[in-house]
Amino acid sequence: MDAARPGHRAPPATARELTTVARLRSVPRVAASLALAGVIGFAVAAHADDGPTADDLRAALAPGATLRVDGQPLRTEILRDFYTSVDFEPVWGPDPDGAARTALALDALTGSRDHGLTPAHYGVPALRRRAELPTAAMALERELLLTDALLRYAVDVRAGRLRPTAVQPDWGIPPPDREDPVHELAQVVVAGTLGAWLEALPPPHEGYARLVTALHALHAAADRVGPSARGAVDQKVRQVSVNLERWRWLPRRFEPRHLVVNAADATLTVIEDGRVRLESRVVVGDELHPTPVVRSEVGAIVFNPPWTVPTSIVVDEFLPKLRANPRFLADNDIAILDRRDDPYGLTVNWAAVSPDHFPFRLQQRPGGWNPLGRMRFATPNRFDVYLHDTPLPELFQREDRALSHGCVRVERARDLALLVLAGQPAGRPEALDRALASSTTGVVSVVRPLPVYLLYWTALVDDEGRLQLRDDPYDRDARVAVGLARNPGTTPRPAGGPATVSHQPAGAGTHR
């Protein structure tokens, strides 16, 4: 493997890869026999250099089998599905094509650390030990372990090791498909395109590739520094690894024209055809009201919007103020909807109002200190968060801008409106300014809805190639880091004696 190559992505095969199933069948055969010893073990005959045979694999993957290698559980049903697709012929055999495929697979698994993954989670130490102990039994174990590991790696590097909602409940973007690519792997083995397939597995985004390069450099630095500096480098490694995982949870393609808010550094960027069209500082949710991760679209802009107060704010903030000052609503021009005879609740006994069953809807009229400012960008989503203007522009001068109840306040709201409405009559500067100067609420539909991604990056690489680390205002990184570090199964123990592939009849034991 070329250690100087960032990402350690598997290169195209240097030896010809297998091109037909018939070529797979040309791998030399080795006799196999079954031996019963508590569990049914597979004692593969001599001639280890020949590798396992199709008969060995059929026996190992017989219905009802439960396979473990050095205590590492293998996914028998998935392996059986894969080997059925290739007529149970070995894939990682000692022939030139099998050796070339093995090199590609091991290069990808070893290079997984530059994607923020852990090679040991894919059995790399166990695989290398088996290469050093070339017995027939070891060859069979290596065949099965490598296939299982490569299928797991393919899912992890393409769609993420973790399910996003398991570590961040307010993740609202559907994650990529996590189905094992059993038939994909079989097809590329037969077609001789394993190297190209491995290259195409990670997310194709430039932001992801930049972080891979940065992580490669951090690993190199960690190998050079002394123990006193190692902790700081390791922390950066963890932070970059967490953000690579977040990239893997995202769609593999963004629309050519889209808007991204990074809640971790409170910035907004509009990108069109690969170019930055607009950048703006924003205010995002505070620690108690974090801005969620979600995709939506700007489908309309509301000028001079009223503010319907969310129930959580009414109960947690307004009700205590009303109990202390019954004129609070009148003083702030907030009315109770559908209560014309007493719009400010001056006759309400607020002390008797239960926070669990608040009976009123409150709305602040447009203008003045309305917290939505002069415009709201309608972005329907299940979290009911949106982008809007603000009457407090001084907040954008603060370094810490995690201050809102979850919605996103945009410093350059007028410029964003002009961009969103470009090509529409309402998007002409003079028309927009007239709408803003009016005290009347108006709604303009957007002809070309703008996709909006509210995301969360605490590590990114800028256009000059510099790694930029951000604070973690919502303390989200730690849970992702813990999940990534967790071993998906039992770590294979060192090979100290004859290792076996064990086969347990159905019902003899379970593994969850």
What are these regions (language model features)?
Residues 1-26:
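N-terminal secretory signal peptides that target proteins for export/translocation
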Residues 14, 27, 46-47, 140:
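Exposed, low-complexity/repetitive linear segments and helix-based recognition motifs
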Residues 31-42:
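Bacterial N-terminal signal peptides
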Residues 49-174:
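Cationic-aromatic interfacial patches
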